[in-house]
Amino acid sequence: VSSLLGLRGNGRACVYTEPMWGLSMMLVMPYASVFMLALGVHDEQIGLLATISMLSQVVFGLLSGVITDKLGRRLTTAVFDVVAWSIPCLIWAVAQNFWYFLVAAVINGAWQVTQNSWDCLLVEDVSRSELTKVYSLVKAAGEFSALFAPIAALLVSRFGLEPAVRLLYLNAFVIMTAKIVI
């Protein structure tokens, strides 16, 4: 607890806002492929989407250092969080077929840029002796979101798969965008 309260600077901002990512994306991820199937996307298309997503991540990963150096860590994190998370969440929320998921998968690969810049922000104000604690706090913050998984299950059982997942993607858009603003 003292590590959490003693954080300062960018490390504090990264750790304190990390649960917002978990609360948005971890609720919807277990339903993503089933949602695609419900919209008529075939198994082999889901596999193709996964492959294209990975290729997009490789390309963005290769460019991430240059982009982060050019734009700076904060601006890169803000811009590419919007590109990699907010925009795809909106696309997924209104998705009708394979093509929506394809566009979102390519755009979502940009999270590799944010991962690079965010990791730099996370550690730049943290002393070497505190690094392990900071990474542990980030991991704990992400896992904390698992406590809210029953909310997604309740939404699916109450409203049905398609409307509930669309709502969860809209929720992810709102929370991720708020995380970026904060």
Show where each model-derived region lies.
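Helix-loop boundary and gating motifs at the non-cytosolic
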Residues: 2-56
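Structural signature of the two symmetry-related core transmembrane helices
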Residues: 75-90
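Helix-to-loop junctions at the C-terminal end of transmembrane segments
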Residues: 60-72, 157
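Symmetry-related core transmembrane helices of the 12-TM Major Facilitator Superfamily/SLC fold
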Residues: 166-182
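Transmembrane alpha-helix termini and helix-breaking/packing motifs in multi-pass membrane transporters
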Residues: 34, 38, 148-169
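Glycine-rich segments within core transmembrane alpha-helices of 12-TM secondary carriers
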Residues: 136-153
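Residue-level signature of mid-helix packing/kink "hotspots" within the transmembrane helices
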Residues: 54-62, 146-147
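Hydrophobic core of transmembrane alpha-helices in multi-pass small-molecule transporters
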Residues: 19, 88, 99-114
